[in-house]
Each structure stands twice: as structure tokens, then as C-alpha cells.
Curated annotation (Swiss-Prot):
Intracellular or extracellular location(s): Membrane
EC number: 1.14.14.137
Organism listed in the record: Arabidopsis thaliana (Mouse-ear cress)
Cross-referenced InterPro entries: Cyt_P450, Cyt_P450_CS, Cyt_P450_E_grp-I, Cyt_P450_sf
Molecular functions (GO terms): (+)-abscisic acid 8'-hydroxylase activity; heme binding; iron ion binding
The family this protein is said to belong to: Belongs to the cytochrome P450 family.
Alphabetically ordered keywords of this record: Heme, Iron, Membrane, Metal-binding, Monooxygenase, NADP, Oxidoreductase, Stress response, Transmembrane, Transmembrane helix
Protein function: Involved in the oxidative degradation of abscisic acid. Plays an important role in determining abscisic acid levels in dry seeds and in the control of postgermination growth.
Membrane-crossing residue ranges in chain numbering: 5-24
Entry's Gene Ontology cellular component terms: membrane
Designated name of the protein: Abscisic acid 8'-hydroxylase 1
Primary subcellular site in the record, as a coarse category: membrane
Amino acid sequence: MDISALFLTLFAGSLFLYFLRCLISQRRFGSSKLPLPPGTMGWPYVGETFQLYSQDPNVFFQSKQKRYGSVFKTHVLGCPCVMISSPEAAKFVLVTKSHLFKPTFPASKERMLGKQAIFFHQGDYHAKLRKLVLRAFMPESIRNMVPDIESIAQDSLRSWEGTMINTYQEMKTYTFNVALLSIFGKDEVLYREDLKRCYYILEKGYNSMPVNLPGTLFHKSMKARKELSQILARILSERRQNGSSHNDLLGSFMGDKEELTDEQIADNIIGVIFAARDTTASVMSWILKYLAENPNVLEAVTEEQMAIRKDKEEGESLTWGDTKKMPLTSRVIQETLRVASILSFTFREAVEDVEYEGYLIPKGWKVLPLFRNIHHSADIFSNPGKFDPSRFEVAPKPNTFMPFGNGTHSCPGNELAKLEMSIMIHHLTTKYSWSIVGASDGIQYGPFALPQNGLPIVLARKPEIEV
């Protein structure tokens, strides 16, 4: 059988299974007294995945909400879904009734990250993992990382001087190196390039269809995933042989009295890299764009950072205390997180039939709280399309600003993310200027919304001035 015939057979089989599932679902839901939420399910199997990832997510989500209301159904990444777009609904799913909605991801991403990763669990195992991750990422732990993160930031900036760079790609390298530092300390130096090579192949298949055939993105990614696990096994073996203790994330995992298995450790390390890298790099790209487009804000941030620099001796490093003297910078980060809404939504799965606002959310269906819709609601944030850090001079109302999620599954590494962004902004604004190359108003859509072409910029060193 040639390859085209094989794919045709697989497609026909998938189509048959899709219609069979639809028939079973129709019979099951037909006996329920509650209706499904309004909405459309798109094409067989692929649903509305292409529409979601090929256009402005604001247009996709807001047009659905405008037509169907704050609760509607769709079909993306091979899954029937209910999308919710109000603070009250998000709280219902993520906090109040979180036990009815287990965390989940598309099948391809679950297999690549590993089934033992913290994202996919609830109950005692999740609580145990979260405690271990928080132990490594709490302020008392990451405050000691400031000099090393600063060194990574300075090395990155020096390598960008005088050249045109793709901001997103370079920030991915920066955040990847910070992620490795937080996970392995300085022990990963010998394996850094191999870890990077394997992970870069792995990430390309995160949103692919889970078809494990030679030549597919999924197949290539799973091969890289296997090699990544082998590298992590070598690192674990070396640490056990050395017998020394470490204050990094790997040390936290290995120091657990109940002992995680090597598979559990590997799955969660890969999961942390996934959570720490692309999202933070995306936010940093948007920060540079918004600062370049808002010179008054850039000037004010620069003044704030220069005031910190003036208190330093030549070559003196930043401290944890310095990073807490950046209120405007913090508001810039918050407003970027709101406007860009890197995390447009999160995935949950109903563990039983659930009623919400008179609609049935069937067991097994994915439920997606739409953070982007909430962050761009004019009822919550006035003039929501405008970049205005001053709006965060007053704390937002509960459940209206959720850039790191909400509830027990909120991102445990958010303090580290804000720290590495603050350190990078300090050195960018006090030592460098940058200009955007080409049009700056385009947006590139995919798993994350990015500035067009990753925001090409030219970075130049500022003349040295007396401080």
C-alpha cells in the first residue's frame, strides 16, 4: 500500500469514527432535559481548529460570544468543547467547582509532555507536585538567582548589539536558558545544547494531530521526546552518584521523601520548560513593541530603572530588593499580559455531566475559560484595546485578570517569569535603544499571538552617561 492510499484509509477511518461518535453523542444527549450550549462544531474531526489558529483570536472568540453569548460550543484540536467567557463562569470552572473539571490538553500535547506532568492531574499527586515546584520557585528560592539571571540577560543583549534580531526567537533562547538555570542550577552546562536541540524539535509538534507515522511532525517530536528523556536520565544518574544536594527544581524533585520515579521527574521537567519558555518570550516581545510604540511610557520606565542604576557602583549586580523598586515596570508587565493575553484560554475536561446556566456540559467534553475575552471586555477594562499601564494603579476586581490562570492550577512559576522580565527590562532601558524594522502593526497567529514576524528589531548600545 503506497503512502497516499494509507493516508486515505486513515482519513476514512477517522471520518467513520467521528460520525459514530456523533451518533452515540446524539442518542446520549437526546435523553437529557438540558440543551447543549449554542454554537457550531465545524468540519468533521478538525472542527474549527484552522479558524482558531489562523486568524485574530479576538475576532474568533468575540464573534462567537457576540453571536451565542458567554457560553457556547465548538470543536477544536479533535475535541468537542464548551467555551466560557465571563469572570463568573471562569471562577465556576477553575475555583468553585474545580473538582468537576480536570486539567487536560490536546492528546498530542499530553503525549509529548508526558502523562505524569503536573498539568494533567488533580488530588494528592497534583498537590504533592505543586508543593515541590513552589518550593523551588517561591521568592525565598528565586531571590538567589538574580545575579545568574542578570548574567544571562547581559550576555543575551551583548550578542544582539548592532544586528537585526527576531525578538521572539532571541527571547525564547533567553527564557530557555533561565528555565534551565531554575531546573538544573549550573549543572546543565554540558547538556545545554543537546537539551535545546531536542526540545526545539519537540515543541514543533505540540499542536499537531497525534498521528505517529514517519514524516509527520508528531512522529519527529516523539523521537525527540525519547532522546530528551534519555538526556534527563543521564543527568539524574550523575546527581545520584555525586550525592550532593541542590536548591533548584530538580533538587526539589529528587529530595522528595516519597521519591518520584524517573518518569515522573522527566515528565515534569519537560512540562516546566514548556510552561516557562514560549509564554514568557511572547510577553517580552510584546513589551518591546508596546514600549517602542508608547515613547512616554518608555521614558518613564527608563527613568525608574535609571534611578535604580544610579544607586549602584560600576559593575554592581542587581539585587532582589532592586526588583521590588519597579512599580511602573510591574504595571507595564501587567498591562502587556492583559492586552496581549498570551494565555488566551486553558483546557479543562468535565469529569461528569455538569449544568451551568441552564446548559449541559457533557462528561468528557473540554471546557475552555476564555481569558482573552475577559481581559478585553469593555465592561471590565475601559477602552480595552488601549495600552495603558496606569489602569493597574488600582488592583483589578477578582477573576477579571488571570494571565497565569486561577485556582489550584494557576502557574506556580509566575514570580520567576516576572523576575526575569524585570531584569531584562532594566538592562534594555538603561543601556540600549531599539527600533522596529518594518511594519509593527501586524500580528502573527498560532499557539500564541505574536508581533508580526517575531518583531524584527535593531538593538543599539546607548552612549555611556554619568549616573
